[in-house]
């Protein structure tokens, strides 16, 4: 989202607070909060349990994070989707920490005890991490090497390239959540689509109608890569092709690199067609 905020903090500057909601929520849990940190007892700001974002957090995992923000120590609610990345920063992503439902043989460690354990873990690490704040909640706490590739910037680059290569392109459908974004576009290029349809039929297919498109997918909460994948709708059935662009959320990856890769989309469609033609001309005795 355009109003996302990324901040970088030292892991050992963070502390975790767990507010229990089971079997009963007690408001005093949200006041006079103290954590043991580096041999000292550190006081933290109160949590306004009537605020909607805080209430939702308490009803979900109950995990809050405290860290330096805007010149002071702030405490913020976390989303459920952030939990796995938080425990990874503490190198404590085990079943005991990740379990939130009991089984016949395994019980759940209360969230306040998980938080105490996380705070102790955080103190052992002096690396930095990247915190994603979205709509007043923490959506992810990722490693220092995580490359921030804003989805809205990538979408703009893709649409500009599509407008250059396929001026008649249209948006087809998509999905969006705090975890994931997917958008599919139809290129509406009759000449190219007809050429590919004929290639499929030469290979033994019985394709009457064919539409070509591109699927874009990414995530800001730890998904390893950005993808732009080619697909065809053959007789109304959508099929992914082998050709695709991918860029890891890691190291020196940038939106400029993605922009450069997008210039190869036209070549990838052509290579897919040539691959089908090659298969059509392959003698099974040679396989």
Task: Identify the function of each model-found stretch.
Residues 1-157:
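Feature for intrinsically disordered/low-complexity regulatory segments and propeptides
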Residues 148-287:
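Intrinsic disorder/low-complexity polar-acidic segments
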